[in-house]
Amino acid sequence: MITDFNARGAACLPGHLGIEIVEVEKGRVHARLPVRQQVMAPNGYLHAGSVVTLADTCCGYGCIASLPEGASNFTTVELKSNHLGTARDGVIECTAVAVHMGRTTQVWDATVSHNGKTIALFRCTQMVLYPKA
């Protein structure tokens, strides 16, 4: 599943930024993102959008890995982030955990860290999609 997720995102935004999924299980996903010039803001610090993309990618892949029987996909309907710190080098990591896995919605929390310190908290709600009859 890890290989599939990394291949799935390779030509899209996660791959463009360099996001690597390293662990996937039902209700939990872990990923990392190398901090480099392409993910920085003009002020020299990590761009908030890079952090949000990492967290949203973790939560989204977690949702896909945990879809209820009969569901075909999902769409994000709400997201929120709190940025508590930043990074200028190294690697940032994200762990997303399911808070609610219902038939019509899922809620996921993600924590983004740098060198063991939490730099962002993220929550998103996803609507579970089913094929049209």
PLM regions with names:
Residues M1-A133:
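Terminal targeting signals and extreme-terminal segments of soluble enzymes
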